[in-house]
């Protein structure tokens, strides 16, 4: 779940790529995009309609000020999460220490969704129940619970 959603529309997105340096130490590269002044365009098939900050608030901060605020908020949150993750039990999933907080911010929990493959094909439909402590989206289908890693599926709400 990497979309930033407001009022059921896509405000932006987050992409995180894990890698290792020359000494084998892990690190992550994080990119965040936010629609500031959005001009409506065609919605991609299976995608969400977009929205901009200017649609949500009359006074939108200057881009450099927004960048500074987002940067510091992300750094503070990552530092706090890192402390909790480093203190977790060894056999717990990587999201265990932040799971409840993470779930509280997810869209479509308890809603009917469609899971699509990276190529856009339909994988399943059902009710989005949760994301487990290992980061898998859990969807209750007619055939039972199915779980998908983030790279396997993208979830979109179904019109009811």
Residue ranges and their predicted role:
Residues 6-160:
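Long, positively charged amphipathic alpha-helical accessory segments at protein N-termini or as interdomain linkers
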């Amino acid at each position: 779940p990497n979309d930033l959603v407001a009022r059921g529309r896509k405000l932006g997105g987050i992409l995180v790529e894990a890698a290792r340096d020359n000494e084998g130490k892990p690190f992550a590269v994080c990119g965040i995009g936010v629609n500031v002044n959005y001009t409506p365009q065609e919605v991609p098939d299976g995608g969400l309609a977009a929205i901009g900050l200017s649609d949500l608030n009359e006074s939108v901060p200057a881009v450099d000020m927004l960048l500074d605020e987002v940067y510091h908020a992300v750094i503070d949150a990552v530092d706090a999460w890192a402390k909790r993750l480093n203190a977790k039990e060894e056999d717990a999933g990587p999201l265990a220490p932040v799971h409840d907080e993470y779930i509280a911010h997810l869209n479509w929990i308890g809603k009917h969704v469609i899971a699509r493959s990276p190529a856009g094909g339909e994988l399943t439909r059902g009710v989005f129940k949760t994301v487990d402590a290992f980061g898998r989206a859990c969807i209750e289908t007619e055939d039972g619970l199915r779980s998908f890693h983030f790279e396997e599926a993208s979830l979109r709400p179904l019109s009811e």
